[in-house]
Amino acid sequence: MSNKTPLVFAMVAGELSGDILGAGLMAALQKNHPDARFVGIGGPRMEALGFRSLFAMEELAVMGIVEVLSRLPRLLTVRASLIKEITALKPDCFIGIDAPDFNIGLELKLKARGIKTVHYVSPSVWAWRPKRIFKIAKATHMVLSLLPFEKAFYDQHQVPCTFVGHTLADDIPFQSDKAAARALLGLDADAEYLAILPGSRGGELKQLAEPFVKAALLIRQNFPDIRFVTPLVNQKRRDQFEQALKDFAPDLEIHMIEGQSREVMAAADGILLASGTATLEAMLVKRPMVVAYRVSPITYRIAKRMMQVERFSLPNLLAGKDLVPELIQEDCTPEKIAAAVTLELNRDFAPLKAEFEALHQVLRRDASLKAAEAVMALVEPKHTQAKSPEAN
């Protein structure tokens, strides 16, 4: 029997997708280390597994350059407090999950204090601000990438990186059952549905709720019997979306559901959604989609100068070609959205579905286990080899 002290992991997740990844990693680590302790910033899924949050995850859920600037004093206060708390804790490893503008600075400080650091989810250094890779190299002992082309970029710059695949590809079946999803959600078995996903952040709904609901009015002209369903991450976002509906399309009926975004996508015949992780989920569920995004004009002008790629949705980035329509900024209008959705709902989906299936295979690698193995390989020198049989 071992009398070693339990492993301690500090982690910071900045939004819903990070909470999902963090919970998967925690569960994989707990299989071989059931007494491990986890502390930092996490969401409800992580907390359900015993994670102790020092701050609410909502503190970090900020989008856009302008929006971040308005919250900067608070973000800096949170980061300074975390540096102090985590340094005193002396964890076996710190794992920053996504949120690169917050986490990489935190990792830099912690690594300088002798703490092992891992960044889970590569920042889009291949897409914009590529020189960030040099800061990442200084800040981390290892990057865990979700996408296959990212590792090649890190290898080129001699920065340690492990491609682990994506937990969504592990969790989502190759064939999503539309009938079962509709039964679960209480939706009509025979109706045609468009899922509308305007994002999980307040800033996203502020930008996208209006063009999305106005587009729905136009789509209804082309498909008089179509129905709309929208998953919203919490009551705050629901209130925000309901207000947009009241302001811009008071006669439009949209069935709103709290959470269950994956089930809503599986139940739909097509999807209109904000750019982000949800586009990957829509691809894995294998439904036709239109991707749209809009930020403040200043944020967009600054970001556009830094962009290194022409595509921004994950299905198109993974494929290296245009699989799904992308409507960004000035193209994110009700008219263009409605036209794109109409085209996607009318076209033969079989060729696109085959592309989605091939990409699903590439990403399905048991990501949480692979991530846990990579973390333990880094932690191992601090613990006896016998402590972690999964590393063998």
UniProtKB/Swiss-Prot annotation:
Superkingdom, natural source: Bacteria
Gene Ontology cellular component terms for the protein in this record: membrane
One of the protein's GO biological processes: lipid A biosynthetic process
SUPFAM superfamilies reported for this sequence: UDP-Glycosyltransferase/glycogen phosphorylase
Keyword Lipid metabolism listed: yes
EC number from the UniProt entry: 2.4.1.182
InterPro entries noted in UniProt: Glyco_trans_19
Pathway membership, UniProt: Bacterial outer membrane biogenesis; LPS lipid A biosynthesis
Reactions performed catalytically: a lipid X + a UDP-2-N,3-O-bis[(3R)-3-hydroxyacyl]-alpha-D-glucosamine = a lipid A disaccharide + UDP + H(+)
GO molecular function terms noted in the UniProt entry: lipid-A-disaccharide synthase activity; phospholipid binding
Record keyword Lipid metabolism present: yes
A UniProt-annotated Pfam family: LpxB
Enzyme class name: transferase
UniProt keywords, alphabetically: Glycosyltransferase, Lipid A biosynthesis, Lipid biosynthesis, Lipid metabolism, Transferase
The protein's role, per its UniProt record: Condensation of UDP-2,3-diacylglucosamine and 2,3-diacylglucosamine-1-phosphate to form lipid A disaccharide, a precursor of lipid A, a phosphorylated glycolipid that anchors the lipopolysaccharide to the outer membrane of the cell.
Membership in a protein family: Belongs to the LpxB family.
HAMAP family noted in UniProt: LpxB
Protein name per Swiss-Prot or TrEMBL: Lipid-A-disaccharide synthase
Gene that specifies this protein: lpxB
